[in-house]
């Protein structure tokens, strides 16, 4: 079973992280999950859910505490065995910390370790509009080998619901790591 690390921050759009978690479970990945304190607040605010409710029934998920720097995810010698690391959604604070090597919590540490060990790192940055600092930090991440994905759904697949739009973005996240899926119709041209 392949491993994925998924970090969910407190940016608006926690639903992207939840959907990615559910799809990875369906695709039989083992997921190591780090949920920030603010992500729990946002989930409650945006969807009236708790993470306990979201995690119910998921078998291949291992939870790591946001401030546990002894987690195996904090170690490069362990993280190299992962298919990749997702930070979904990624707050601009988390983007800044990862881009500048500041480790305030396990999510920041996992991002930094992924970059230093060349483990694929994918950040779904959820902010609008971007300012110069955001763009510079995205450029830093990209230059270090990470991939920054905007939370921007397309419309060529003619979405009929919010779920269709979420599926498109999550599908793009999976595409970055070359994970097969059927979440949206591909462009036919």
UniProtKB/Swiss-Prot annotation:
Entry binding sites for dimethylallyl phosphate: 156, 172
The family this protein is said to belong to: Belongs to the UbiX/PAD1 family.
GO terms assigned for molecular function: carboxy-lyase activity; flavin prenyltransferase activity
Class of the enzyme per the UniProt entry, highest EC level: transferase
This protein's record includes keyword Flavoprotein: yes
Protein name: Flavin prenyltransferase UbiX
EC number annotated for this UniProt entry: 2.5.1.129
Role according to the record: Flavin prenyltransferase that catalyzes the synthesis of the prenylated FMN cofactor (prenyl-FMN) for 4-hydroxy-3-polyprenylbenzoic acid decarboxylase UbiD. The prenyltransferase is metal-independent and links a dimethylallyl moiety from dimethylallyl monophosphate (DMAP) to the flavin N5 and C6 atoms of FMN.
UniProtKB keywords: Flavoprotein, FMN, Prenyltransferase, Transferase
Reaction(s) this enzyme catalyzes, per UniProt: dimethylallyl phosphate + FMNH2 = prenylated FMNH2 + phosphate
Coiled coil: none
Any one Pfam family match given in the protein's UniProt record, by short name: Flavoprotein
InterPro entries (alphabetical): Flavin_trans-like, Flavoprotein, UbiX-like
HAMAP family assigned to the protein according to its UniProt record, in alphabetical order: ubiX_pad (MF_01984)
